[in-house]
């Protein structure tokens, strides 16, 4: 898979760095070991952060700046990483979806980056381009219906949008039948070392909980 970062993104975030993780996997409805890790993370994070200080996490602060620069209110269209951590800090439980989605959510919270997870076999073409959503652009967010993505960073394949930091698209979503996983880590803070560490963490989780073939990743800018 080739990933292109458009001039639109370079204009609002010249320091952007991303990582693309790809792996053959075996998904499951639930994994107890993974949820033990998620619960332990939740207990720790509640002692370290508040709903205000979480905005200072570098990846979250950076994507909020990009939203504002693109004309989007980050408090109305929260980046997924922020929304997930906020939910834990408010004493709520996370939604349990399936092992791959739950695993990606943990990785997103652990590093503060918005991470897109996709069934790679549902992506049309061999290239994804990261740009900015346009007025009236159709986009069906997972569990959200039609989402107004004007001003949001968006990955597009040959057909249209597949992922934003707020919500991925129904068309390319991960299901229990997914065997070919594509994960995109979005480092709007420009911290390449941290983005690479996040990719390595995901590869480790995939081997532990999703029968991964080992997987690979590459960095793109």
Regions found by a protein language model. Give the residues of each.
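Charge-biased, low-complexity intrinsically disordered regions
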Residues: 1-221
